[in-house]
């Protein structure tokens, strides 16, 4: 509905392509993305669902299969962050980020893999972050969740390779998206100074 997810959806939008777009809260953004994808000729089905909920994932995929058939490409992009000292986090805040960031990946992979294995074909792309490799101060849970995605992706890639299913993760650096909109001008400039290109990446890139 925004950011990297929206850019990926539009990049995949072309005549006869069938897209299933999911967002939990941003219904306006979801509708906007769907309309842009349709303008490019794609067939689009949208769902408002919490992908950290296994039963919600099961329901939306059942409906998607009924409309479009089995999933060929799964992009796991759901993600939230929590900024602050680890010692100030509550267990519920920690669990919520983990549920969305890694729980959603496991839910959707678990539900689409059987069909992919049966058809001996499938592609899975998990959206990760450089913080999953190096960690980020005051983003302990976000870093942990992305590190989990990286390890899960490597393990699943080995497990599914004999079934002709490719599993990869993209560990983005700093990208100009709504998730980073909270940065002050000074913080954004300091972040840009640490990037060789001297700026954040764009979602289109």
Language-model segment annotations:
Residues 114, 158-162:
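Alpha-helical segment proximal to the catalytic Tyr-Lys
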Residues 86-87, 134-140, 162-163, 198:
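Active-site loop immediately N-terminal to the catalytic Tyr-X3-Lys motif
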Residues 85-86, 93-95, 180, 187, ...:
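Substrate-binding pocket helix/loop in short-chain dehydrogenase/reductase
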Residues 129:
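Residue(s) in the substrate-gating loop at a strand-loop-helix junction
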Residues 15-31:
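Conserved glycine-rich Rossmann-like NAD(P)H-binding loop of the short-chain dehydrogenase/reductase
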Residues 109, 145, 153:
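Active-site helix of classical SDR
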Residues 1-2:
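Conserved glycine-rich cofactor-binding loop
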């Amino acid at each position: 509905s925004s950011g990297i997810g929206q850019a990926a959806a539009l990049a995949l939008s072309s005549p006869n392509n069938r897209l299933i777009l999911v967002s939990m809260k941003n219904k306006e953004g979801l509708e906007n993305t769907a309309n842009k994808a349709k303008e490019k000729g794609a067939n689009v089905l949208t769902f408002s669902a919490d992908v950290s909920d296994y039963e919600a994932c099961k329901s939306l995929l059942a409906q998607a299969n009924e409309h479009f058939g089995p999933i060929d490409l799964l992009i796991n992009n759901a993600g939230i962050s929590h900024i602050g000292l680890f010692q100030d986090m509550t267990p519920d805040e920690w669990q919520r980020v983990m549920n969305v960031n890694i729980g959603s990946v496991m839910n959707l992979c678990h539900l689409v893999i059987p069909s992919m294995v049966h058809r001996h074909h499938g592609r899975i792309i998990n959206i990760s972050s450089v913080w999953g490799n190096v960690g980020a101060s005051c983003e302990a849970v976000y870093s942990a969740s992305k590190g989990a995605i990286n390890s899960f992706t490597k393990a699943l890639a080995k497990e599914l390779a004999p079934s002709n299913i490719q599993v990869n993760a993209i560990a983005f650096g700093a990208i100009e998206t709504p998730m980073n909109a909270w940065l002050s001008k000074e913080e954004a400039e300091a972040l840009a100074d640490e990037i060789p290109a001297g700026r954040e990446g764009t979602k289109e890139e």
